[in-house]
């Protein structure tokens, strides 16, 4: 099966993913010093400033972020949304690992634990809405 995600999307390394998650979790653009602090305190990543700026340069080349200076500080701004990334990532997993079958993906996700009634009801609503649209 052809996998368009790998052709159209430039995937993220594990380090790039953590950096993007830290950026996406912020409500506004984040300064590089603040990003370094969030990476250290929230994600346990003790990256040097040069390491973070190198990753940001790579992320900018892939179209995920833009960086800019404001006064003496540099800032990172997410260009691609977390929702778009997660949607493409899930579709990639569905196509690559589960033969394009959503039922196989859902089955795998439910295999390690039972759904609560609330979760099952919410999934039913999502499925009903997607069939009717």
What does each of the following model-derived ranges do?
Residues 66-67, 117:
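Short beta-strand "wing" residues that participate in macromolecule-binding interfaces
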Residues 53-57:
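Short, hydrophobic-biased segments on the C-terminal half of alpha helices
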Residues 88-132:
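Amphipathic alpha-helical dimerization/coiled-coil segments
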Residues 1-22, 26, 133:
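Short alpha-helical segments that sit at the start of domains
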Residues 70-89:
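Short, cationic-aromatic polyanion-contact patches
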Residues 37-47:
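Short helix-coil junctions and helix-kink-helix linkers
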Residues 63:
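Glycine-centered, phosphate/nucleic-acid-interacting loop/turn motifs that mediate DNA/RNA or nucleotide
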Residues 29-39:
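Short acidic, hydrophobic short linear motifs in intrinsically disordered regions
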